[in-house]
Amino acid sequence: MEVQRKTVPVKKASKNGFLKSVLVFTLIVSFSVLLLGGYWIFKGLAPRPVEVSGPNGEVLMTKSSISGGQAVFQKYALMDYGTILGHGSYMGPDYTAEALKIYTEGMQDFKAEAQYGKRFKQLSDEKQSTIRNHVIREMRKNRYDRPSDTLKLTDAQVYGLHQVRAHYRKVFTKGDGWGLEPGLIKESHMPERDRAWVDSEDQITQISDFIFWTAWLSSTLRPGDDITYTNNWPYDEDAGNTMSFAAVWWSGASVTILILFVGIILFVFYRYKLGMKEAYQEGAFPVFDLDKQPLTASQVKTGKYFAVVSLLFFVQAMFGALLAHYYIEPDSFFGIDWIRELLPFSISKGFHLQLAIFWIATSWLGMGIFAAPLVGGREPKRQGLLVDILFWALIVLVGGSMVGEWLGAKGFLGNNWFLFGHQGMEYIELGRFWQVILALGMLIWLFIVFRGIKSGLKRESDKGGLIHLLFYSSIAIPLFYGAAFFFNPGTNITMSDFWRWWIIHLWVEGIFEVFAVVVIGFLLVQMNLVTKKSTVRTIYFQLTILLGSGVIGIGHHYYYNGSSEVWIGLGSVFSCLEVIPLTLLVLEAYEQYKMMKDGGHHFPYKATFWFLISTAIWNLVGAGVLGFLINLPAVSYFEHGQFLTPAHGHGAMMGVYGMFAIAVWLYTLRNITKKEAWNDKWLKIACWSLNIGLFGMVFINLLPVGFLQLKKAFEDGYWSSRAPEFLQQDVVQTLLTWRAVPDTIFLAGIVILVVFSIRALFHLRKPTHREGEALPVKDIASDE
């Protein structure tokens, strides 16, 4: 390995100037469109009127009761049980679609009784058709008056509202007969006065009003338009909701544009040779002697990070297994009632999601800490102390947030539910206080990384070089998490969802992907496997097409959540284009496989490369193919919020980000663990177990159920595909039961990683260099 002690940069002309300009231009345009689209959403939000009254002037609802109902919905973690406007979890119903069905049937019965003295279902087909058409016209007319900020409901609509209230009064007191516990919402959970976010009146009435309001906006036309606030979603012909022309047109247009850009991107890729080039000659593969590799105290301290990561991964998977079981036996766990009472579906789902983010992010943070001295060339003073502080901060964060989420969802925190408890938004369950701790933890990590790579940044003359790209991508991790602070329970649910997807799509799926692309490039250069020059060019190309498609591609989450129709066009086109960079990663996987083969039997990083190859394959299959399947507006219209969504979610979250987290986790452990304690054979078994198990989950369980659910929605209306009766069908129950097989295979792989990582703690190498001492490592800052 080369020893580089130079600290004075040599000023040279900027490299890759054109590629840099294209990337910067792409970022400016993409985020401008996204923010402008967000402003468009804000201006077109469905109103929450100051007063909602009936034909006689009696006040039925207020803005406070609607907003308070949203807070109640979030406080009891109902987004981790069912869905609202199609977003959330899949055990319970979609509350919007369910309420719309009840609201519509209530209006039909009211009209039938008024005109014929009979209930709607007792009428002849001809009379039913007359009533149905009358109800559709009445409910789709927008009676909101903007100057007075009031909404008038007709007699039939008022009756429909009362039916919705009666239904949810029963559900939230006696349970829903499926997975929702009786007596979930209690007035004793909140103080009588000065409630945080929740209105002073009865909480069940408030949540009923909120759910009814989502049904109203899904069936009421936008002013001056012929589609509803939700672009005619959910599909319910009795309510007049059918697929819009925009959904059909943009589905076809997006595929056409995809085909065009596949050709363009592939031409550019091959014409300008934008792939990574090997840095070694055939037969002269780099030799790695890990016993002689320099090691610092802070690097050794990352060992405990990965031991905790393995345990978090195991616990997260066990919660996943519990959730899968609840679909078979929703009211207990093999007859043990106290487990369901202690860990109901909603709380377990929140833990499952949060732990996934925690273990994946912690793995990436640990690798960043390890890499910092390699980049900077020395260990900063007291770096190890900062690493220890961050470690214990993460322990407090994970433990504290989980306890808080449980206490909040169970109603024990009173007015502090949002601050310390369960925030109630999928993927952002942890309370606001814990969010602050998480953000501070990421800033501490960024400071640790900056201290480690600071001298490398100074030495690298190119401000767009590999070290700078690593630093910029590190900054983006805490920066983009800031979107989680832009909304609260009082924010309109559609606007909250706009910012929530910044966390899920932009932060997890976008910035994590950016960091992964840069880190993979860094690792390959650090190991002398590829040239720095070709790697930097490749990274710029990948980031341009990744962010150019992905930033605006967030719009496929905005099709039917109350956002403006423009997002159907933007989201469909750019989400289709997201497939292209993911496809190109398969070419990278082949190159990685070839490098591993060239390394032969003695190549020490085989386990890392197995998981890097897994990452690339799942990037195409899980994120690309399965994402493309559900992102077409015409498919999403019927599928939105069904089992095909978690099929994509598992393939992308675990298949891409999870597999990559394991890759960097094993890379770091390989460098800090004694050679005699390493066993690639067991890690190979773990890799196959995780991939086979994940494949089984997705293709044997989630996809088949999702296709059946899609068919049910198309034939009988969306609400029917989300009713408990669908999940209770024999064929669905059989598929859900057989999931135990791939789940068990998957868990076996995790157990191997847990044992391996904890065992590694007792076989760590000793630091070879002290703080401030120069490390004999390849100088990534130097020009080739």
Regions found by a protein language model. Give the residues of each.
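Soluble extramembrane regions of membrane proteins in the secretory/endomembrane system
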Residues: 44-246
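Post-cleavage N-terminal segment of exported redox proteins
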Residues: 2-62
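Cytosolic-side membrane-insertion boundary helix
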Residues: 232-256, 291-302
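Hydrophobic cores of alpha-helical transmembrane segments in multi-pass integral membrane proteins
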Residues: 20-40, 73, 81, 225, ...
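Membrane-interfacial, low-structure loops and terminal tails that flank and connect transmembrane helices
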Residues: 2-16, 275-302, 458-462, 595-604, ...
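Hydrophobic or amphipathic alpha-helical targeting/insertion segments
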Residues: 80-83, 89-123, 128, 382-449
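Non-cytosolic membrane-interface motifs at loop->transmembrane helix junctions
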Residues: 420-432, 495-505, 563-574, 640-646
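Perimembrane loop-to-helix junctions flanking transmembrane segments
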Residues: 55-57, 332-347, 641
